[in-house]
Regions:
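Helix-centered, glycine/charged polyanion-binding patches within enzymatic domains
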Residues: 101, 105-106, 111-188
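Alpha-helical structural motif
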Residues: 6, 10, 92, 155-158, ...
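Short glycine-rich loop/turn motifs that provide flexible caps or phosphate-binding loops at active sites
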Residues: 27, 59, 65, 77, ...
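Charged alpha-helix within mobile-element recombinases
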Residues: 10-20, 165-166, 188-191, 195
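Short amphipathic alpha-helical "recognition" segments used for binding
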Residues: 72, 96, 164, 171, ...
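Polybasic low-complexity intrinsically disordered regions
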Residues: 1-127, 132-134, 199
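C-terminal domain-tail junction helix/linker
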Residues: 181-197, 201-206
């Protein structure tokens, strides 16, 4: 199942059903990433990695051995629209273009994704750019940009709640398997379970 990519295929089938039911709002996409611990314990210095697809990165002052889960969440419904799994060292910015669905009215993301060319590309496609503005060397952010950042941050909180739910209730704080292929399939299945439960909630509210 994992080798054949059936997890992603099943997720796509559910996405079609959610669209047919009119549950996906497309008001905006909330894009973010979170760190997930690898299944085996981290290797000691000089030891070979117990998981060849996991990697080290730093979170604040602490080291982290594992993976990074990237999500695209539908603003308004809270449904997961896309998911990706990479090593922890992979920059979330590198995956941004692949996380944009293309049919959303807006995209909201934190400052890690901020690039002028990226913002222009979104606007050229008619997509509102809600990427948080970052100060650059010799170019501090303006007061207007600070106000926008506060609004973008409020909108983005919804994706952080999704991550919190996935880690608290679906065990996404640690991988269950060794290797990216099996873990990627497992996380697609978790995304399916999350969306099925969310679907029942949304249908009950209509």
């Amino acid at each position: 199942m994992a080798q054949a990519g059936l997890g992603e295929s099943l997720f796509a089938l559910l996405e079609e059903q959610l669209q047919a039911k009119g549950l996906i709002v497309r008001r905006g996409s909330l894009i973010d990433a979170t760190l997930v611990k690898a299944q085996p314990h981290p290797p000691r210095r000089g030891e070979p990695s117990p998981d060849p697809d996991a990697d080290w990165t730093r979170r604040g002052k602490d080291g982290h051995f594992g993976y990074k889960v990237h999500l695209t969440v539908d603003q308004g419904s809270g449904l997961i629209r896309h998911l990706a799994l990479t090593s922890a060292r992979t920059s979330e910015s590198n995956l941004f273009e692949g996380m944009v669905i293309g049919d959303e009215a807006a995209v909201f993301a934190d400052g890690a994704y901020a690039k002028d060319a990226r913002k222009k590309a979104l606007r050229s496609r008619g997509i509102f750019c809600g990427i948080i503005n970052r100060p650059w060397r010799y170019r501090p952010i303006t007061e207007n940009q600070k106000r926008r950042n506060k609004f973008y941050s409020r909108v983005r909180r919804a994706v952080e709640r999704v991550f919190g739910t996935l880690k608290r209730l679906y065990g996404m704080d640690r991988c269950r398997y060794v290797g990216g292929v099996r873990n990627r399939c497992h996380f697609w299945l978790k995304g399916i379970c999350f969306n099925l439960k969310k679907m029942l909630v949304l249908q009950g509210a209509t």
